[in-house]
Amino acid sequence: MDEKWRLSKKDALAASCSSSSTSSKSKFSRSFSTSASSSKAPAFVRSSSTKCSVPSSSSSSISRSSSKKEKGSITQKYSSLAKEQKGRFYIMRRCVAMLVCWHKHDS
């Protein structure tokens, strides 16, 4: 069985729009094909739900109240990204400290 990994169009859009949901879920779809039969099995797609929407031509005129909502969501997005990076840095710092301690005790 041949396995072909590709990024589906829906997941490519979600990957460009989502912030922290990409760290725990895979964005690739897998399609299977067999050499014995001429027809291909349907592609199985595993995706995550995102809160990102596709911009449309009708949303080009933004009122001041909606721009404040977008500004708040952008602030919230970057705040959550900063918290995630801070958590990752803390874990890495603890791991390095543990490895240094093991190295000192080993010597």
Swiss-Prot record:
Disulfide bonds: none annotated. Residues 1-79 are annotated as: Disordered. Residues 73-104 are annotated as: Required for DVL/RTFL small polypeptide activity. It is found in: Cell membrane. Residues 13-65 have a biased composition (Low complexity). InterPro entries: DVL (IPR012552), DVL_RTFL_polypeptides (IPR052692). One of its GO terms (biological process) is negative regulation of cell population proliferation. GO terms for cellular component: plasma membrane. It is a single-pass membrane protein. Its main location: membrane. Residues 1-12 have a biased composition (Basic and acidic residues). Keywords: Cell membrane, Developmental protein, Membrane, Transmembrane, Transmembrane helix. The chain crosses the membrane at residues 9-29. Small polypeptide acting as a regulatory molecule which coordinates cellular responses required for differentiation, growth and development, probably by restricting polar cell proliferation in lateral organs and coordinating socket cell recruitment and differentiation at trichome sites. PANTHER family: DVL13, SMALL POLYPEPTIDE DEVIL 9. Belongs to the DVL/RTFL small polypeptides family. This is Small polypeptide DEVIL 9. It comes from Arabidopsis thaliana (Mouse-ear cress). The gene is DVL9.
